[in-house]
Amino acid sequence: MPHPRRYHSSERGSRGSYHEHYQSRKHKRRRSRSWSSSSDRTRRRRREDSYHVRSRSSYDDHSSDRRLYDRRYCGSYRRNDYSRDRGEAYYDTDFRQSYEYHRENSSYRSQRSSRRKHRRRRRRSRTFSRSSSHSSRRAKSVEDDAEGHLIYHVGDWLQERYEIVSTLGEGTFGRVVQCVDHRRGGTQVALKIIKNVEKYKEAARLEINVLEKINEKDPDNKNLCVQMFDWFDYHGHMCISFELLGLSTFDFLKDNNYLPYPIHQVRHMAFQLCQAVKFLHDNKLTHTDLKPENILFVNSDYELTYNLEKKRDERSVKSTAVRVVDFGSATFDHEHHSTIVSTRHYRAPEVILELGWSQPCDVWSIGCIIFEYYVGFTLFQTHDNREHLAMMERILGPVPSRMIRKTRKQKYFYRGRLDWDENTSAGRYVRENCKPLRRYLTSEAEDHHQLFDLIENMLEYEPAKRLTLGEALQHPFFACLRTEPPNTKLWDSSRDISR
């Protein structure tokens, strides 16, 4: 297979910011980014429940088969909410069959056919970066596979700068590869290569816009959000260069047989997470997709010990320094807020009930994440709104009547109470696998009770009563980690990066 063709690209500084270039494009008129991105997010979230990689089977008569802790794993750099079916649907069925047939018969005729297919696909997408003027005329040596992934090999160079070392992961959005950045003195970086599919490219553009503004606000990378080094368009593939990080906190948990993190590690990881997301909130930005998959260790090296009682090896991460990643769904306060946000298991009740959302929905997600670190499994393992609300009531108590009166989703309620039958298969599942929050405590030690007090306040039903992250950082559970006086800010929030 031919290798990607090399092109020299101008430095990022010479082409201006992503936002400036995006606004200056002379293509045909299109809808505003905030409208189009939000509608895309809405479509994506509305379909999430049917295809998310961690979904359980639908209700049946075999409740014993519905395991609360069964979490299927997608070995990608980050988990995302696009389905494989939606990614493939970009291509016509006939095109996919033809492509696969010709790949099996690797002849000169198949190569010409493949080029014609690439030309047809290129007419359906638009290039973006000024430095990628060559991209509008795809080089004969650059090919995509049937799903739109760039075909590459170890040792290939991109932009005469990035030398591919290995593949770190693959998702429906694209692939992430480890590269040597020869313009940064041989620094190892993670390069996200987005599929040559317009909806994924648009999501990447939105993420770039947010990351550039975060970089402007936090040039020294003190606020624990992943650092973007560079971006470019390589023959229709949006590429984003990031600092190279370790495994996600979910991947490490899975590889460790879902053994919970020790409480001192939970404390440090939770403290950093609150710091990073508070930085976003102070600058009028809501992440909207916080989950263990989107929190990565800076270095996931570990020590291995053998547990005689359980007769298995157990891993303990050496450093709990983390970074928050994946800003593709992040939303500024002034932007349109789509109805549904967040991955199901970390979705706040105001989102489920369509009461509107803002920064407190991130706090709810953080509460769910901290719980998962502590016990090793997801708090709300479901993909159905009614069942999700039933789990909340079983664990946290009744949904407030004020929220019930305000919601448009009255189909979930009857006479001011959740319409839920505990004698069904779903009802038995919730009753057998969910219990009041405090009953998940594994120790009666004071710091364990402090942790659950923090989680309870983060999982307050009503957003206005929910703990803010500024308050969370002052919680007694974090007392041993606080090095700054209570009123000292870790950053200057007087500047607004939202515009």
Curated annotation (Swiss-Prot):
Notes on activation and inhibition: 5,6-dichloro-1-b-D-ribofuranosylbenzimidazole (DRB) inhibits autophosphorylation. TG003 inhibits its kinase activity and affects the regulation of alternative splicing mediated by phosphorylation of SR proteins.
Reaction(s) this enzyme catalyzes, per UniProt: L-seryl-[protein] + ATP = O-phospho-L-seryl-[protein] + ADP + H(+); L-threonyl-[protein] + ATP = O-phospho-L-threonyl-[protein] + ADP + H(+); L-tyrosyl-[protein] + ATP = O-phospho-L-tyrosyl-[protein] + ADP + H(+)
UniProt feature, compositional bias: Basic residues: 24-33, 112-127
Residue span, Protein kinase domain: 163-479
SMART domains per record: S_TKc
Record's comment on post-translational modification: Autophosphorylates on all three types of residues. Phosphorylation on Ser-34 and Thr-127 by AKT1 is induced by ionizing radiation or insulin. Phosphorylation plays a critical role in cell proliferation following low dose radiation and prevents cell death following high dose radiation. Phosphorylation at Thr-343 by PKB/AKT2 induces its kinase activity which is required for its stability. The phosphorylation status at Ser-141 influences its subnuclear localization; inhibition of phosphorylation at Ser-141 results in accumulation in the nuclear speckle.
InterPro entries in the record: CLK_kinases (IPR051175), Kinase-like_dom_sf (IPR011009), Prot_kinase_dom (IPR000719), Protein_kinase_ATP_BS (IPR017441), Ser/Thr_kinase_AS (IPR008271)
Enzyme Commission no: 2.7.12.1
PANTHER family for this protein: DUAL SPECIFICITY PROTEIN KINASE CLK2, SERINE/THREONINE-PROTEIN KINASE DOA-RELATED
Assembly and interaction partners: Interacts with RBMX and UBL5. Interacts with AKT1.
Protein name stated in the entry: Dual specificity protein kinase CLK2
Species annotation: Mus musculus (Mouse)
